[in-house]
Amino acid sequence: MEGLESVYAQAMYGMTRESKIMEHQGSDLIWGGNELMARELCSSSSYHHQLINPNLSSCFMSDLGVLGEIQQQQHVGNRASSIDPSSLDCLLSATSNSNNTSTEDDEGISVLFSDCQTLWSFGGVSSAESENREITTETTTTIKPKPLKRNRGGDGGTTETTTTTTKPKSLKRNRGDETGSHFSLVHPQDDSEKGGFKLIYDENQSKSKKPRTEKERGGSSNISFQHSTCLSDNVEPDAEAIAQMKEMIYRAAAFRPVNFGLEIVEKPKRKNVKISTDPQTVAARQRRERISEKIRVLQTLVPGGTKMDTASMLDEAANYLKFLRAQVKALENLRPKLDQTNLSFSSAPTSFPLFHPSFLPLQNPNQIHHPEC
């Protein structure tokens, strides 16, 4: 009884499966611009129906006859006793047909997934070049069913194999200006290689860029030295102007009052520092203190010395000393001339008449004389 119920359940499942498949076959399947019509599917299902093993169906029918007699003897249900062997044969063929169609659908789905994988790999390659160039690609995948091949097994049964081929069209690229790098996409020839396309770098086309001519290089490297000669001519006036400015500063500084008194500088207080009493270290410290005091005095004498470091201040002090020596020599040369002028003034007459008409005071004519009382 349990075996009969299981067979009946499988038969009902096959009928529902066949009805769904027939409804699904009414719609067209479109992929890559090609249509798979329901006629081909119906022909394949009828072909599968013819390929059922007759020995297996006869054995199954004998078993069903025995089960029918047992069911009639036990009087269990009028529903199971009324099953016709021909209808069971149809149901069995439907189940086998549904199994074959399910395997065919699985093969079709695997083919579609492989095509999707190729398109995905191609999209990944093309997206890498879409930053600097506009790539227009036209790819169409055609699915052409080849004639069915029958492979006879050892048990007398036949199996069916279907093969599909995909033919991508050639890639077209709209190029503007040559940039020196060229890539090409090639479909792999070997079936063992998975994926979509290969990326090949073309070195011959990268060399097609025109090299720069020697004239252009020579023209770009020309340098005119006219401006540099003008700058070299202007160096001397700048040096003279600087010398004149320094001379003016030195003359202004020479008339300033000079204070040679040593300024008392507070020594910085150091914490946690032990001062050594060694005579050599004490002598070296005193020598450094004297040098620093003299440098401070020299900075006050040299114009602008307080705003300079020690090295530049010493250079400025040497220049200022040269200027002072030149001024001393110039004054020494002027001394005899001053002595001669003093002698000429001393030999001239210095006595003048006291009552000279020119020295008489002028009287006011409008002066009123009052009479004396």
UniProtKB/Swiss-Prot annotation:
Residues 188-218 have a biased composition (Basic and acidic residues). InterPro entries: bHLH_dom, HLH_DNA-bd_sf, IND-like. The keyword Transferase does not apply. It is found in: Nucleus. This is Transcription factor bHLH87. Flowers. It comes from Arabidopsis thaliana. Homodimer. Keywords: DNA-binding, Nucleus, Transcription, Transcription regulation. One of its GO terms (biological process) is regulation of DNA-templated transcription. Pfam families: HLH. Residues 127-227 are annotated as: Disordered. Residues 275-324 form the bHLH domain. GO terms for molecular function: DNA-binding transcription factor activity; protein dimerization activity; transcription cis-regulatory region binding. Disulfide bonds: none annotated. PROSITE patterns: BHLH (PS50888). PANTHER family: TRANSCRIPTION FACTOR BHLH87 (PTHR45914:SF12), TRANSCRIPTION FACTOR HEC3-RELATED (PTHR45914). Its main location: nucleus.
